A protein has these predicted regions:
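A solvent-exposed, acidic/Ser-Thr-rich amphipathic alpha-helical stretch
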Residues: 22-105
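Short beta-strand edge/turn micro-motifs at domain boundaries
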Residues: 98-106, 123-156
Length: 161
């Protein structure tokens, strides 16, 4: 997870893409502010619910291609992004911890983005990643990003969260 964040920070997007499975599901569900007794329903995570982001690897690859053209209006010049990853925990290992072929990990993140002279954004939240063994390494098969804010306060989502 740290390597993945560093590759994205360094704009090495093609290498970054190689850390995801071909059947990747990358989601950022919308969060709602609800009463305390409805707290378990605050994130819209159902298959038909709307999300800020709901993409697969082909869509991420197209976004990388757009960035590389140099004419992507929302990312020209490219943003400078720093991702801080912390509180990484293994939540589940299948079929067992000793013989894991799939692992679910959660972490907290802070993303800082600067573009041009005075455009800056900060995003904080939690990520849940399902990783799948691929030989001697692990690939991310599913990522769900849970933002801590019900209103998206960034000007654009042209960068990768």
């Amino acid at each position: 997870l740290y390597e993945e964040a560093e590759l994205a920070d360094e704009r090495r997007f093609e290498e970054w893409l190689s850390l995801f499975t071909d059947d990747l599901q990358y989601r950022m569900p919308i969060v709602r502010s609800l009463a305390a007794n409805d707290i378990g329903k605050e994130y819209l995570t159902g298959p038909l619910d709307i999300s800020w982001v709901d993409e697969g690897k082909p869509t991420l690859a197209m976004r990388v291609q757009q960035l590389r053209t140099g004419v992507h209006w929302a990312e020209e010049p490219l943003s400078r992004v720093t991702r801080l990853i912390t509180n990484v925990r293994i939540v589940e290992a299948l079929p067992s911890a000793e013989e894991a072929q799939e692992v679910e990990a959660s972490c907290k993140f802070l993303l800082y983005r600067n573009r041009n002279a005075d455009n800056q954004d900060t995003i904080i939240g939690k990520r849940v990643d399902r990783m799948r063994r691929a030989g001697d390494s692990w690939l991310i098969a599913r990522r769900t990003v849970f933002l801590n804010q019900p209103v998206l306060l960034v000007n654009t989502l042209s960068f990768f969260v």
